[in-house]
Amino acid sequence: AQKNYQVQSPNRDIKVEVTVADKVTFAIVQDHSEVMNSAVSMTLQGGEVLGANPKVLKVTKTSVDKEIPSPFYKKDVVKDIYNEMQISFRGNYGLVFRVYNDGVAYRFTTKRKEPIVIADEEAVYNFPSDYKTFTAYVNSTKPTFEEQFFNSFEQPYANETITGLNDKRLKILPLLVDLGDGRKICITEADLEDFPGMFLNNETGKPSFKAVHAPYPKVKEQGGHNQLQMLVKERENYIAKTSGTRSFPWRAFIISRNDKELADCDMVYRLASPSRVNDISWIKPGKVAWDWWNDWNLYGVDFRAGINN
């Protein structure tokens, strides 16, 4: 039988509606109108699909209102205020949804004794209209996604509708969708560790984006610019080999009513794992002007500068 769960933002403007039937889907609702929806699942090597024919064991809701110290950021502290819903499923996995006043995030979790191999993660972000976007393609026009995975992530943003985007080229995050009336939703990710970064590609003829992940490297060789890069020559048939008990990357959606809210949003900072650097007394924040690029050199110092050791 279908089951429905929901969690709202602290100010009640944004809501996530989760539907559990033969698969798991969720919708983001703002001001009683659906912004987007998606099916979510994670396929393990061997064929097990986390999210297929799911059986809910427990749903836990919590409210958090705390501050995160941010000594090297544009703010001294970051306010972390959200409502969270954790759904635990039979099979030792779960989904976590967080709803902030300025957006939504979700992630998979697993609790297994042995390491697991992830074949793929499903995410298909469907929009109700063919909205305009601000999209950065990979800076490669090569014909296959395999060839496009190797890129510098340096590309201007194109302002095109979802269906007007080139579906033969991968898109990089963050990607911004213009919902009209000044509202926008920014798709990005956070707390990405031991997992490939997410690309997006538009579904042909549909106002939707599908997640694409680079498979894990099997064979690498040194090459590229000045022989400074490791080039992938062959890939495995999975995207990650990782700990069986872990939280996976957050898939985040920043929702703004005007553009200045985007500039002031701290969502990626909030979603990051706590710093593992215990002693930060030696870190002195300041400005740097590409010291690693401009001749790799320093001047006026009492030692021989440069790449010489």
Identify the residue ranges that each predicted region occupies.
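An acidic-aromatic substrate-binding cleft motif
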Residues: 239-308
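N-terminal accessory beta-strand-rich subdomains and adjacent acidic, glycine-rich linkers
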Residues: 4-268
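Generic detector of bulky aromatic hydrophobic side chains
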Residues: 10, 20, 106-108, 287-293, ...
